[in-house]
């Protein structure tokens, strides 16, 4: 039996199994040991079953796959060769695990006889990602003693675990040489595949698992709790689950606190700012019940409120993950928000607390005055909705600007917002944005800090394949301006936290053949944006600001509002 032919047969069964589980995008890094998987991926692409994407940097490739999976809400498979190539996927695997994004990570490996004996590019890859995958599938070296049916069943068992929890399945696949001298005809006619012939021509899984019924029942005490004073807090949600929350909370007369990732239009905008007001915060803590939809709040003030609240606490979130960092004694509903709302009709009543609305209106005027008309981080955050395309998507990086956007921006209802807030790292943000663009096939606005951009420069190469207008805003405040929020000596802060780079991104754009603009005023920016939307390619828009402008304004707004006296 030819080793190279059987390697391909083994790989064929693996990828055919994943395709039947919803994989339509394969992200591939170049490498020799992964050749059997790569050649089967090419065969599937030629058959129209999948789309293959390539990238030379495995760390970026992992986040690119993450972005596609976020946008398509379908699992994505990654194929890499053996050695440290595999380790570069770790950050994306962590982010996927934290947020329940489904990835299949296929790591080619040296065969066991080459482990721990000084062989080249052979590292310990079994279970190498620790507890972050929902399942680790450590396959043996391809061997006809194992039936193809066994291989499918083993993989589908891991898929079942993924569907229950959401996250990453790591499949480690050792291959012995030779890797190259197999033809499609030899693979397709191999006797080992004969029991699968009917399965191979059908688009159905090997094991049929009936969908779990997730009917949401009204809480037995809902008629009691809906008469009480409540606060609705909305965190990160899929866009389709945002509809109806605002009107439901308004009908109840309850206070609504929203995160920028929620897709919900706030009734009392600028929550991150006005929650700094101690008088209003103390009154808000007198609520009888808090109902939280979604999780992972950006706002420090909302998090502080959740931590301080000691009353009845309900959490509605579909993943089943533990998402209460403040460890309330709570009632948990594993449900989609719109299903839960349908089962819990509102009781129409007047607002029980008027101060948030009054303070929100005051904030609107005060913030406009403080931000002014210059092109700055804060003004970009405040007026970001005017730059967004209809039927587009927004990606926010993890920098000072995401906090400013959360504090100042009011987006249209259900406007898709993507972030990497599972681990909130600054790695892979460009790659994720590129993946979201490819996966959604919609115009994309990505807003990313300069340090984050420097950390992921290789991923600019991924934007050459976008087919929709893509605007990459790089906020260049000369380093990590978010660290201005820390109570650290200025000299120490510059040397060990902010790390000024004193550079710009014009040459980077040229290197990756991207359109580039550096607007100085809002008039310049509006012209640049108009041109960018006329092109079905990526434009890098660099916004240069003074290092401390954004953080100083943010701190000033919070300080001023914290002492404001507003009559309801």
From Swiss-Prot:
It comes from Haemophilus influenzae (strain ATCC 51907 / DSM 11121 / KW20 / Rd). Its EC number is 2.2.1.9. GO terms for biological process: menaquinone biosynthetic process. It comes from the Bacteria. SUPFAM superfamilies: Thiamin diphosphate-binding fold (THDP-binding). It holds the Pfam family TPP_enzyme_N. PANTHER family: 2-SUCCINYL-5-ENOLPYRUVYL-6-HYDROXY-3-CYCLOHEXENE-1-CARBOXYLATE SYNTHASE, PROTEIN PHYLLO, CHLOROPLASTIC. Binds 1 thiamine pyrophosphate per subunit. Keywords: Magnesium, Manganese, Menaquinone biosynthesis, Metal-binding, Thiamine pyrophosphate, Transferase. Belongs to the TPP enzyme family. MenD subfamily. This is 2-succinyl-5-enolpyruvyl-6-hydroxy-3-cyclohexene-1-carboxylate synthase. Homodimer. One of its GO terms (molecular function) is magnesium ion binding. InterPro entries: MenaQ_synth_MenD, MenD_middle, THDP-binding, Thiamin_PyroP_enz_TPP-bd_dom, TPP_enzyme_TPP-bd. Pathway: Quinol/quinone metabolism; 1,4-dihydroxy-2-naphthoate biosynthesis; 1,4-dihydroxy-2-naphthoate from chorismate: step 2/7; Quinol/quinone metabolism; menaquinone biosynthesis.
């Amino acid at each position: 039996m030819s080793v190279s032919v059987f390697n391909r047969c083994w790989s064929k069964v693996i990828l055919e199994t994943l395709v039947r589980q919803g994989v339509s995008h394969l992200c591939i890094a170049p490498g020799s040991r992964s050749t059997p998987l790569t050649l089967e991926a090419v065969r599937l692409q030629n058959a129209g079953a999948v789309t293959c994407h390539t990238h030379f940097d495995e760390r970026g490739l992992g986040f690119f796959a993450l972005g596609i999976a976020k946008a398509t809400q379908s699992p994505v498979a990654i194929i890499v060769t053996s050695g440290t190539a595999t380790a570069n996927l770790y950050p994306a695997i962590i982010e996927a695990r934290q947020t329940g994004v489904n990835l299949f990570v296929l790591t080619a490996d040296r065969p066991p006889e080459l482990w721990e004996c000084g062989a080249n590019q052979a590292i310990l890859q079994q279970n190498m990602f620790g507890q972050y995958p929902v399942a680790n599938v450590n396959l043996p070296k391809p061997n006809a003693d194992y039936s193809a049916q066994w291989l499918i069943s083993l993989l589908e068992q891991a898929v079942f675990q993924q569907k229950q929890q959401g996250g990453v399945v790591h499949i480690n696949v050792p291959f012995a040489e030779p890797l190259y001298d197999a033809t499609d005809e030899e693979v397709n006619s191999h006797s080992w595949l004969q029991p699968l012939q009917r399965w191979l021509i059908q688009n159905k899984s090997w094991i049929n698992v009936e969908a779990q019924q997730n009917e949401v029942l009204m809480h037995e005490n809902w008629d009691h709790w809906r008469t009480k004073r409540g606060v609705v807090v909305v965190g990160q949600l899929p866009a389709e689950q945002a509809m109806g929350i605002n009107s439901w909370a308004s009908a109840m007369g309850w206070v609504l606190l929203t995160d920028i990732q929620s897709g919900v239009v706030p009734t009392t905008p600028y929550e991150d700012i006005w929650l700094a007001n101690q008088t209003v915060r103390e009154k808000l803590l007198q609520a009888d019940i808090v109902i939280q939809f979604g999780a992972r709040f950006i706002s420090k003030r909302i998090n502080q409120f959740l931590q301080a609240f000691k009353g009845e606490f309900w959490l509605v979130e579909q993943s089943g993950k533990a998402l209460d960092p403040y460890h309330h004694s709570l009632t948990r509903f594993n449900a989609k928000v719109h299903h839960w709302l349908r089962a819990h009709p509102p009781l129409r009543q007047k607002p029980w607390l008027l101060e948030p609305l009054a303070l929100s209106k005051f904030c609107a005027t005060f913030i406009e005055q403080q931000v002014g008309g210059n092109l700055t981080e804060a003004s970009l955050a405040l007026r970001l909705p005017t730059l967004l395309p209809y039927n587009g998507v927004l990606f926010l990086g993890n920098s000072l600007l995401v906090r400013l956007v959360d504090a100042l921006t009011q987006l249209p209802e259900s406007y898709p917002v993507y972030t990497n807030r599972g681990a909130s790292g600054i790695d892979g943000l460009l790659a994720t944005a590129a993946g979201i663009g490819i996966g959604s096939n919609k115009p994309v606005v990505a807003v990313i800090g300069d340090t984050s951009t420097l950390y992921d420069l290789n991923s600019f190469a991924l934007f050459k394949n976008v087919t929709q207008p893509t605007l990459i805003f790089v906020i260049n405040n000369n380093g990590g301006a978010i660290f201005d929020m820390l109570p650290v000596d200025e000299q120490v802060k510059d040397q060990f936290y902010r790390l000024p780079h004193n550079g710009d991104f014009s040459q980077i754009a040229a290197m990756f053949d991207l359109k580039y603009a550096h607007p100085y005023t809002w008039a310049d920016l509006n012209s640049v944006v108009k041109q960018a939307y006329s092109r079905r390619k990526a434009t890098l828009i660099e916004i240069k600001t003074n290092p401390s402008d954004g953080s100083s304004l943010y701190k000033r707004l919070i300080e001023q509002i914290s002492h404001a006296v507003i009559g309801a």
